[in-house]
């Protein structure tokens, strides 16, 4: 995503290029930004997963700018010297021909430690909290299911009119989608609890019981998500 107006400051969010196709797409976009007289203020990363960070070596061949992100995200980029640490309530301001655009940082660390969203008048840059199709993985390795559900509720409380998500198309009028996500995760949480109470004692058996309504689910992912709920 690119924040800001044509001819003003621009912030590039999650460029995440890792191959030639991505390189060419970003290169074309940056050329378009520069052609309209804009300056690139910074690169903002919503979280530290590689599908959002991309290859910094490739990115730096196209443009150089300070990197902004949470402490956890910046710790994954030790080679970057010019940085700004973002945390809850911080304001990202980009100046443009018609005025200043402000985006408030909101922490939603459930999917990944240090994940942030950016809340502005056009909507919310919502990182990996939800998507139009399917569900979002909350890795048992470093995710936090309770924090993830709380983050969804936090997003819903804003009553945003658009979510700009990390995967798939933007979500217009997202209250319904957020409610579905919250209800789905809470229901799955209860099914995991029921599996334990019924006597299931291995992760495999808990996952089979908790995901009995989706027999086609990938067994490894089902076990990982069951562990996250546990």
List the predicted regions and their residue ranges:
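Conserved beta-strand hairpin/beta-sheet module of binuclear metal-dependent hydrolase folds
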Residues: 1-32, 117-129
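Active-site environment of divalent metal-dependent phosphoester hydrolases
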Residues: 19-20, 48-54, 74-77, 112-115, ...
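Core dinuclear metal-dependent hydrolase active-site scaffold
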Residues: 2, 91-119
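Active-site neighborhood of phospho(di)ester-bond hydrolases with catalytic His/Asp-centered motifs
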Residues: 13-15, 39-49, 67-71, 107-110, ...
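Surface-exposed cleft-lining segments at the edges of enzyme active sites
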Residues: 134-142
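Divalent-metal (often Zn2+) His-rich catalytic cores of metallo-beta-lactamase-fold enzymes
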Residues: 145-199
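C-terminal regulatory/interaction regions
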Residues: 194-230
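Active-site HxH/HxHxD metal-binding segment of metal-dependent hydrolases
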Residues: 17-101
């Amino acid at each position: 995503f690119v924040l800001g107006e044509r001819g003003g400051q621009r912030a590039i969010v999650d460029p995440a290029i890792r191959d030639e196709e991505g390189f060419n797409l970003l290169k074309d976009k940056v050329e378009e930004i520069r052609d309209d007289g804009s300056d690139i203020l910074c690169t903002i990363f919503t979280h530290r997963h590689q599908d959002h960070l991309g290859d910094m070596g490739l990115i730096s061949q196209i443009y150089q700018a300070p990197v902004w992100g949470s402490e956890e995200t910046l710790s994954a980029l030790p080679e970057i010297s010019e940085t700004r640490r973002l945390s809850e309530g911080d304001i990202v301001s980009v100046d443009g021909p018609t005025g200043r655009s402000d985006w408030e940082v909101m922490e939603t660390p459930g999917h990944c430690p240090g994940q942030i969203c950016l809340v502005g008048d056009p909507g919310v840059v919502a990182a990996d909290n939800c998507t139009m199709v399917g569900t979002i993985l909350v890795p048992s390795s470093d995710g936090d299911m309770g924090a993830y559900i709380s983050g969804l509720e936090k997003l819903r409380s804003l009553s945003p009119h658009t979510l700009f998500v990390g995967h798939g198309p933007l979500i217009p009028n997202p209250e319904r989608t957020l409610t579905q996500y919250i209800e789905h995760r809470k229901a799955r949480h209860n099914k995991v609890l029921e599996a334990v109470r019924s006597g299931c004692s291995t992760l495999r058996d808990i996952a089979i019981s908790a995901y009995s309504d989706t027999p086609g689910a990938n067994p490894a992912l089902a076990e990982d998500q069951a562990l996250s709920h546990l």
